[in-house]
Amino acid sequence: MILVNVHAGNCDNTLKNFKKKLQRELYFRKMKEQRYYEPKSVKRVRKAQEAARRKRKFARKRMYED
C-alpha cells in the first residue's frame, strides 16, 4: 500500500510524489504485464532477456568505473 501525505492542501506536489512512488514500486509495469495473459514460455523468455539486458548494463557501468 502506498501512502502519500498532503501538506497544506498542496495537491500538485502530492500527485507528483504519488506518481514517483508508483514508478519506484514498478506498479505501472506490473499493470501492463497483467493486462493480457502471457504464457509461461513467453514469460520465461522475456525474463531471460530482461536479465541479460541488466547484466550488459551492469558490465558497461563497471567498464567505465575501472
Swiss-Prot record:
A GO BP annotation: translation
Top-level taxon: Bacteria
Region (Disordered): 47-66
Gene (name only): rpsU
Record's GO cellular component terms: ribonucleoprotein complex; ribosome
Keyword RNA-binding among record annotations: no
This protein's name: Small ribosomal subunit protein bS21
Record's compositionally biased regions (Basic residues): 53-66
Assigned keywords, A-Z: Ribonucleoprotein, Ribosomal protein
Molecular-function GO terms, alphabetical: structural constituent of ribosome
Protein family according to the UniProt entry: Belongs to the bacterial ribosomal protein bS21 family.
